[in-house]
Amino acid sequence: MKLQLIVVLLIALVIVSLVDGEMLEKRCKNRLKKCTSNSECCDKKDRGGRKLRCLTXCDERHCLTYKQCLFYPGLQKVKRLCFTYCRCTI
């Protein structure tokens, strides 16, 4: 009886850890969170229909040393904001 209970508890722990692992993998990053690729950012759109992308941004005319999930305003606006002031690369 005790052995069966232990086996059932072990199986339950394995199932919970598998489900929790899948949940962690499916989590995405919201706006302003650090990222390394577009796939890490949540598949959300703002009011203007812009999607979150993993971009290098500027802070007071200097490039940040990391990328963030930001709403992508289009190449022209990103160039104007980043390339003109601090020559960031997308």
Curated annotation (Swiss-Prot):
Keyword Secreted appears in the UniProt entry: yes
Q: What is this protein called?
A: U-metritoxin-Msn2a
Q: What is its main location?
A: secreted
Q: Which residues form the signal peptide?
A: 1-21
- Please name the source species: Metridium senile (Brown sea anemone)
Location relative to the cell: Secreted; Nematocyst
Which domain of life does the protein's organism represent?
Eukaryota
Give the family from UniProt.
Answer: Belongs to the sea anemone type 5 potassium channel toxin family.
PTM (free text): Contains 4 disulfide bonds.
Residue ranges annotated as propeptide in the record? 22-27, 77-90
Q: List keywords of the entry alphabetically.
A: Cleavage on pair of basic residues, Disulfide bond, Ion channel impairing toxin, Nematocyst, Neurotoxin, Potassium channel impairing toxin, Secreted, Signal, Toxin, Voltage-gated potassium channel impairing toxin
Main role?
Answer: Neurotoxin. Blocks voltage-gated potassium channel (Kv). In vivo, induces a rapid increase in swimming speed on zebrafish larvae, as well as death which occurs between 2 and 18 hours later.
Which GO CC annotations does the UniProt entry carry? Answer: extracellular region; nematocyst
Per the record's keyword annotation, is Thylakoid included, yes or no?
Answer: no
A GO MF label: toxin activity
